[in-house]
Amino acid sequence: MRLPIDVSKISEKDRTNPTVLLLLESIQKQAELIQELKDEIARLKGQSPRPKIRPSRLENTIKSTGKRKGKKGSGSRKKKKTVTLQIHDTIPIEPEDIPDGAVFKGYNDFIVQGLKIEAHNIRYRLKAYETPDGKYICAKLPDNLKGKHFSPDIVCFILYQYHQCGVTQPLLLEQLQEFGIDISKGTLNSILNENKNDFHKEKDQILAAGLEVSSYVNVDDTGARHMGKNGYCTHIGNEAFSWFESTGSKSRINFLQLLRAGHSDYSINVDAIAYMLVNKLPKQPLNAIIANRGTIFSNESQWQEFLVDNDIKNKRHQQIATEGVLLGSIIEYGISKNMVIVSDDAGQFNILSHALCWVHAERLIQKIIPFSDKARKDLETIRDQIWHLYKNLKEYKQSPNDNDKKRLQNLFDQIFNTKTHSAMLNEALKRINGNKSELLLVLDRPDIPLHNNSAENAIRDYVKKRKISGSTRSDSGRKCRDTFTSLKKTCRKLGVSFWQYLHDRICGLNKVPKLSDLIRQQILSTA
């Protein structure tokens, strides 16, 4: 943000004074804090805060100087866009005033695309017969109706409009009624939120399959109020799938519980004990846990009883122990110990092998405002060097080798150990340098991304839905929002039409493969 002091009025001599520069940077920090508090007050009042800072330039595309691939030449024939369309009706048209002796030579086709939007009501007349012995035999409704008074097509349309197109329930109700559909507010809500167990099951299979075959996942979270209380939605995914789950917490315990992919047990195994040792669990509780190595607790209640029985009462000790047995559980179920978690440096995601997003790291530099010519020059130099390093890391991913690995490590040290004329810039460089191992994990694992854009883009879609429809007010509503956001985003990543997917599942056609199978196929084919 802009400094609340006109720097141009400060003399050139004072601008080079270290004390003055330190004071200016201190004022800048205070101004940013004041603006953040103003933004929070504005949000609480229902007003709009200040606009966000411009995005990082790290992922800006380089303009191509050559010709675009696939661009048509001046002499190429124009491709007919309608050649593959299914034709539903054919209407021949005769010319006016055909003279005698004219010979028919064929047709000039002109394709018109249309869409029918109208009510289509069906009366099923279930025949009933009486047998000679006095019993009655009655016909049954088609299975895909499931005893409901609304066809699968209407159910598909409602789900698609609400989850894919972001149409709110009031507008969707008005739309259906204008189309001639006799439907109430309660019935619409029921169609959206009830009897969705098959979809919930497939959503859970998405996470299980993704964790089973992936070498990395991108993670992020966002606020998700529920029933008037603060809550959070966590995203787990990568280029092949997206999975969302809303809970009341954003702790590491919560994240580990989500990674269990539907399982509920707690395992004391080698991996659990190793985690507790790394996190310095004291000897007394650690010995009690080691003495029960190999024990599996089927649910949280049994685990809590174990903690009480073994006099593990300290909150921090309980936290470390619980995180350990949860980690032991997810590794027990097949998650690789080499799984990389790519995040924006939120502490709850720092488990297994942890990689950080370069775009988020560069934002620390981007927000700095220099107060002297030397500081401005230093900032420009550092940003150019970071851009050069990032570009080199992208090239390294395509062709990793030991020589480039060593060179890039040295380049990182050279950039982030630099001392500049800006105290704020020095502090930012020091902070980034402290995350060296997580930012340069790509040198050992060139299969992982350099940024967390995949998770950010996915969570942005959830935020858009939250802004349109507000917070959830029922458990079924929250569960359905998570489920259909997961299914929609995963379909998009797999190249599956969400409309065709909904139609296939609701009509019971089973022509679209399980999304979990498609995830395995896509990830394994690119491994």
Tell me the role of every PLM-derived stretch.
Residues 1-148, 189, 219, 265-321:
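Short, flexible loop/hinge motifs at secondary-structure junctions
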